[in-house]
């Protein structure tokens, strides 16, 4: 007797598609998102775990911790578990109601924390206030490049000196040959996670013109331009990195 397919396993690109649609955070994607991101982003679990550690280091009493593009809420949950200040409020923002539906269940089942608020909104439309910690894990890369500085400037304006932005992104490298080498290493990583060449190719096509990576230099330069005093990479695995920016 054959096993029933696992509905939480990412097989969205397993069958040939005439023309893969542009990638969106749809109901189908939301349903398999934890499996998708863990099998697609090397070092993801480490980034999530350390997000909690970094957030706890910088969270101020009576301040707000924001997770912009929170999806299922893994990073915000990590922060909530590590932050000791009961007066801190934690706010998760996502424009996908399908993601937020699962995030609400996630928090109810694992935390039941009344400090956590989840909101459906475009992160470009929100007003940030008294933000001691802002989490942008694998979110900025989906924001059009022309709007990224505006968002980061708004984040910095909501902070006091010493507050922190945690920014995780897929990177591109200025050396084309090294960039291609890391892309192929990433594809090999995904093969080791059980993805087929067809799945890798079709998802890459779906993400083209949707996920736009930048170089480390571009990120650091922009962060300085909007007013962060210090910033650099604290973790990297292949072409995925996490930066910390201190206000």
PLM features: what roles do these ranges have?
Residues 149-161:
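A short glycine-rich, Lys/Arg-flanked "PGG" loop and its adjoining helix->strand segment in the class I
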Residues 66, 73-124:
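Class I SAM-dependent methyltransferase SAM/SAH-binding core
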Residues 1-22:
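N-terminal auxiliary segments of SAM/dcSAM-dependent transferases
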Residues 166-192:
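Conserved class I S-adenosyl-L-methionine
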Residues 18-23, 29-47:
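Class I SAM-dependent methyltransferase Rossmann-like catalytic core
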